[in-house]
Regions:
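C-terminal "cap" of GNAT-fold acetyltransferases
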Residues: 3, 108-122, 127-150
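Acetyl-CoA-dependent GNAT
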Residues: 3-77, 82, 95-96, 101, ...
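Generic structural motif
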Residues: 11, 56, 84, 117, ...
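Loop/helix-junction capping segments adjacent to catalytic residues or to phosphate/diphosphate-binding pockets
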Residues: 14, 88, 119
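Base-recognition residues in the alpha-helical recognition helix of bacterial helix-turn-helix
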Residues: 78, 86, 114
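Conserved acetyl-CoA-binding loop-helix of GNAT-fold acetyltransferases
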Residues: 81, 87-100, 123-127
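Short coil/turn segments at alpha/beta junctions that flank glycine-rich nucleotide-binding fingerprints
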Residues: 88, 105-108
Length: 150
């Protein structure tokens, strides 16, 4: 198996949509039940900072975050890794690279949301220094405070 190559902001909206569809059964609640994937992929491609994992020219992992320079708050909108690339640290590598990028941009905090019932994802985020900051229905809000880097 080829090693994962990490790129930033290189995936097209079509590649992102294809990746999200391929990951749909990995999510606790199917992504297609929550968003319109083509529109979501287009928004990510246009507005998010994307840290991408590629293997054999196929997008196997994606962490996408929006950054508001005025508030210095980043929001991770997507963390997804194909089943074939899970369990070998791919998601952690991509998440840490995203955190580093947000800190370089000046983020003082990084936020994300996760389904309360998704124990695997919750543990993953706790392992990466995110803490619970609130609840909205069955959605757990998490935050990581950052040291800014320049």
């Amino acid at each position: 198996m080829q090693r994962m190559i990490i790129r930033q902001n290189s995936a097209t909206a079509e590649e992102i949509a294809s990746h999200l569809r391929a990951c749909d059964d990995v999510f606790v609640r199917a992504l297609e039940q929550r968003v319109e994937i083509v529109a979501y992929a287009d928004k990510i491609a246009r507005l998010a900072h994307c840290i991408e994992g590629w293997r054999d020219e196929r997008l196997v992992g994606l962490v996408a975050a929006y950054f508001n320079a005025q508030t210095r708050i980043a929001f991770i909108t997507n963390v997804s890794v194909l089943a074939e690339a899970q369990g070998i640290g791919s998601g952690g590598i991509l998440l840490e690279q995203c955190i580093a990028k947000m800190q370089t941009l000046g983020a003082t905090e990084i936020r994300l949301e996760v389904e309360e019932s998704n124990q695997v994802a919750r543990y993953f985020y706790l392992k990466h220094a995110f803490i619970q900051s609130g609840m909205s229905g069955n959605i757990l809000q998490m935050i990581r405070h950052c040291e800014t880097r320049t």
